Amino acid sequence: MNILHLDSSILGDHSASRQLSRDVVEAYKSTHADSHVTYRDLASEALGHFSAASLAAAGTPVEARDAAQQQEVDNNEATLQQFLDADVLVIGAPMYNFSIPSQLKAWIDRIAVAGRTFRYSEAGPEGLCGGKKVIIVSTSGGLHQGLPTGAGHEELLKALFAFIGITDLQFVRAHGLAYGEEPRANAMAAAKQQIESELLAA
């Protein structure tokens, strides 16, 4: 069982999503003794944003690439392969300005690859990544779930993973974290209880 654990919060030890994503991984490991965890901190070891240079590197024949292009291709392939090798993904995904962190979006741009994680056919797009499980730790200062202001956060992630064929998607939520000490404590406690009841009991 290969677990890919991704954090994207810029808040370090003060991050709620980091704390809860660790809890999710530990809970999953406790019920899956054969688990192997690969950890990636997308904030401290950020991928560059996908660019024209990224496309040019991928489209340049191997023998014609310069060193920078080859490094770009190698980094992108390593990121994609890390995703493909994972059976379970645990993703810390805080809301920043009504969406996900740009660091997480940069990772998504490396794993949404035509011919590798999805393809187009006469019937339309087809996801190629079925069989994986994704657990998303969703945190936010406000309360946006089900509102237009939340469309670029959880709904974006749902659409992306569905597009590449992943239907086993679970959210652990701690929202309203900026509403004061008591609401924050209550939201964190509820998320921890969800982890215990849904993951430790699995």
From Swiss-Prot:
Record flagged with keyword Flavoprotein: yes
EC number(s) reported in the record: 1.6.5.-, 1.7.1.17
Binding site for FMN: S9, S15, A16, S17, M95, Y96, N97, F98, T139, S140, G141, G142
Comment on bound cofactor: Binds 1 FMN per subunit.
InterPro entries: Flavodoxin_fold, Flavoprotein-like_sf, FMN-dep_NADH:Q_OxRdtase_AzoR1, NADH:quinone_OxRdtase_FMN_depd
One Pfam family here: Flavodoxin_2
SUPFAM superfamilies: Flavoproteins
Single Gene Ontology MF annotation: oxidoreductase activity, acting on NAD(P)H as acceptor
Keyword vocabulary terms for this entry: Flavoprotein, FMN, NAD, Oxidoreductase
Cofactor(s) required for function per UniProt: FMN
Gene3D superfamilies, per the entry: 3.40.50.360
Catalytic activity reported: 2 a quinone + NADH + H(+) = 2 a 1,4-benzosemiquinone + NAD(+); N,N-dimethyl-1,4-phenylenediamine + anthranilate + 2 NAD(+) = 2-(4-dimethylaminophenyl)diazenylbenzoate + 2 NADH + 2 H(+)
Family note: Belongs to the azoreductase type 1 family.
Binding partners and assembly: Homodimer.
HAMAP family: Azoreductase_type1 (MF_01216)
Function: Quinone reductase that provides resistance to thiol-specific stress caused by electrophilic quinones. Also exhibits azoreductase activity. Catalyzes the reductive cleavage of the azo bond in aromatic azo compounds to the corresponding amines.
Protein name, per record: FMN-dependent NADH:quinone oxidoreductase 1
Organism expressing this protein natively: Pseudomonas syringae pv. tomato (strain ATCC BAA-871 / DC3000)
Gene of this entry: azoR1
